[in-house]
Amino acid sequence: MLTLDQMVGQEKIKAYFQRARAVSHLSHAYILSGEEGMGKKTLAQAIALLLVCEEGGDSPCLCCHACRQVLAHSHPDVIELVKEKSISVDDIRSKINDTVDIRPFSAPVKIYIIDHAERMNVQAQNALLKTIEEPPSYVIIFLLTTNREVFLDTIQSRCIHLRMQPLPVEVVAQKLKESYPITDMQAREYATYARGNLGRAKNLLEDEAKRIRYQKNVKILKDIGNFTLEQMVKVLAEMKEEDSNFSEFLQFIRDWYRDVLIVLVGADVRKLIFSTEMKTMKEKAEQYSLTKVNQILEAVDLAQDRIQANVKAELAMQMLLMEMKVGEDNG
């Protein structure tokens, strides 16, 4: 668990909480939103650590009984609600509503952290709304989410919304270099691919299945011109088990052809995502016309639209891969 000072980035949000705490003007409910891997839970826990520390300094001491309890996830006044699937009304009632009127055991505040709060169904949101509307003065609720739009308007209007921002690619690359045995170029590629999301970049390096899928995707796009229909069917069937609506692969294809486009038009190659594939990108740029690359990018959007319209995903993807193959055949 990190302190606010140890967290990388999110300077505006960290400064906000430091100021709000200094003048005793913390809100009773916050929505922390951002992509998976942006550090929403880490941030909420760091704030909890700061607020319950017995020393009351600008940074938690990490030594007092309260700090040690938070670090061990056992502080009675820092309650986390984590559910793998949906969050039901019973979950909200038992974890929050039934305990909210019990004063803090030892801390000056009572903090509730709801992870993946977008998993609350409407009934659960309505149950939580009652607490958010009239909370005890000592209560602070954090709703952590990848999509705040799923919340009822009445909940959104009663919470302060703070959005987690991506880190500069250079910062993520440096952090990866410090933690993993990779080259500068690899670090930059993963950081760029993750779009400044440190958690996502780390997950790609630590999760063997994701790393293998990344490498397989690169190979598919490098070799697509030589694929037969049978090979396309095979790779799509394998991929569907990991990514049922192919959303990650579709974004991967966009990123790949974006890089081809950068080389094709002579733009700054430092902006490439797949920087370790520079040689391949130059070869692809020689094979494609600008019109053809744009047609493929439009075909990617069309494939996604078809899948969202309930066209069989494998069929939509086969049509896309055929378009990409024809592009290599004809330029």
Show the residue positions of the predicted features.
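Clamp-loader machinery-focused feature within the broader ASCE/P-loop NTPase space
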Residues: M1-Q123
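Charged, glycine-rich active-site and insertion segments that engage polyanionic ligands
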Residues: M1-L49, A66-Q69, S137-Y138, N147-F252, ...
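Catalytic acidic motif of RecA-like/P-loop NTPases
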Residues: D115-N121, N126-E133, E149
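Conserved catalytic/switch belt of AAA+ P-loop NTPases
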Residues: D101, N126-L143
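Structural signal for conserved beta-strand scaffold positions within catalytic alpha/beta enzyme cores
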Residues: E80-V82, L143, H161-R163
